[in-house]
Amino acid sequence: KTTSDVIDNYRSNQSKESASLVRLASSPWMYRLFLMRHLPMAFIARLKVKEISLTSCTISVPYNWINKNPFRSTYFAVLSMAAEMSTGLLAMAYVRNAKPSISMLVTNIEGSFTKKAVGPTMFKCNSGDAMRLAIEEAIITSQPQTFRCQTIGTNGQGDEIALFYITWSFKVKNSKSGS
């Protein structure tokens, strides 16, 4: 197969798989079941998908007793989890049941906090298109690719609460060993 054939095959298969993940994440009931099974801490923290497409994802995290710290703001680890999820759902949309099979892994996370989170916080990542290109590059070259996503957390007034950079590694799995 030519490189073009491999990418065309990936895109054809992934358009259905990506749409399936977007539907799952858009259904509150199915999303909660997914969290309970695969990400129970996100379920406990009550992270919610506010918006998801193949280009962007917005995750909300409430300010409540289980998420707060002793300083009466949302605990940084909960904010970090929401930030990672806003990028991770986009990545999952592009690697879920991919042909060829692709692994994804967070290799770095950087966060800066600009304001106390004392209410609901929304994390939005708009890196879906660029992320897809990085994944396609991993397929074309058969070499691991890293991609650095930006996600911005804002409060209900639109003020920036936090800025995160999540670095993902994408690698085509070896079909013989499954790794």
Predicted regions and their residues:
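Hot-dog-fold acyl-thioester-processing enzymes
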Residues: 66-88, 101
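Catalytic strand-loop segment that frames the active site of acyl-thioester-processing enzymes
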Residues: 44-74
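HotDog/MaoC-like acyl-thioester-processing domains
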Residues: 1-23, 117-118, 128-179
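Short Pro/Gly-enriched beta-strand edge/turn motifs at strand-loop
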Residues: 27-36, 41-42, 132-134
